[in-house]
Amino acid sequence: MDKSFQMKIVDAFTQKTGNTYNSLYFYGEHQHTKAVVDYIIESYRTHHPEANILRLDAEEFRAESIRKVRSGGHYTIPTCDLFVLEYIDGVAGLEANEQRLYGILDWLLENNRQIVITGTAPTAAITNLAPRIRTQIDGGIAYSAAIGK
């Protein structure tokens, strides 16, 4: 995919909120996905300066889940305009985390919030990813973050 097409996808995603381009999933090496996430957040802030953006990596997501369980608390749905989860591979196969993620993605989609998820490979290649989460992610746009791939 060439860079100009990739940027058109990101620009469309950040300018038009809601379900049209939701969710956005891209995969590849960390330096590529991080660069695209940085660009998405910068672009989103340009078009929506007051937006509440929540950016978590899989490790932070898991740690927050563990804290909630240990404290006896309930999972809360993040009230953000843009939810970014980096490296879904780190959540895949962990039932409690996947259950929480499914609820979050469901609420965000129903409430027309933007979702960005990254991974190391296409969702079909993440064999331990729960089918219902794969379906949620695959309902949007997916592409390789590596320019020219």
Regions found by a protein language model. Give the residues of each.
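Pre-Walker A (pre-P-loop) alpha-helix and adjacent loop at the N terminus of AAA/AAA+ ATPase modules
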Residues: 1-23
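Sensor-1/coupling segment of RecA-like P-loop NTPase cores
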Residues: 104-131
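P-loop NTPase Walker A phosphate-binding motif
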Residues: 34-49
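Walker A/P-loop nucleotide-binding motif
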Residues: 18-38
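Walker B catalytic acidic pair
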Residues: 86-90, 120
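Conserved ATPase-coupling elements of RecA-like P-loop NTPase cores
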Residues: 89-102, 126-129
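A short helix-turn-beta junction within AAA+ P-loop NTPase domains corresponding to the substrate/partner-engaging
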Residues: 129-148
